[in-house]
Amino acid sequence: MSTTRRRRPALVALVTIAACGCLALGWWQWTRFQSASGTFQNLGYALQWPLFAGFCLYTYHNFVRYEESPPQPRHMNCIAEIPPELLPARPKPEQQPPDDPALRKYNTYLAELAKQDAENHNRTTT
């Protein structure tokens, strides 16, 4: 990376406007709290808006620090995939015997329903 610092006038202006806007909204809520119709909700907002302004400045500061730091070296000796013996084996479904009486009875019932449906022409599918 280069050793010269980048100048970001548009970003600095955006952060400054955002922080000043948050402080102005905090001042507005403070004056609303002090008025005759002010509530504790206005006080809460009056205390929150300066925190939002501080958050704008904090995130800009972190952005600049992150951008100026050198990129982290990639470790090529890292494991890129999970070894198959690390995970437990997936359970397999039990095989039904082909002469299962309950399955045979159920299939017969389904065949009767299909036959009745075909006789009555009550098709619900296209």
From Swiss-Prot:
Residues 1-19 form the signal peptide. Keywords: Cell membrane, Lipoprotein, Membrane, Palmitate, Signal, Transmembrane, Transmembrane helix. This is Putative lipoprotein LprD. The chain crosses the membrane at residues 44-64. To M.tuberculosis Rv1343c. It comes from Mycobacterium leprae (strain TN). A lipid is attached at C20 (N-palmitoyl cysteine). A lipid is attached at C20 (S-diacylglycerol cysteine). It is found in: Cell membrane. It is a lipid-anchor; Single-pass membrane protein.
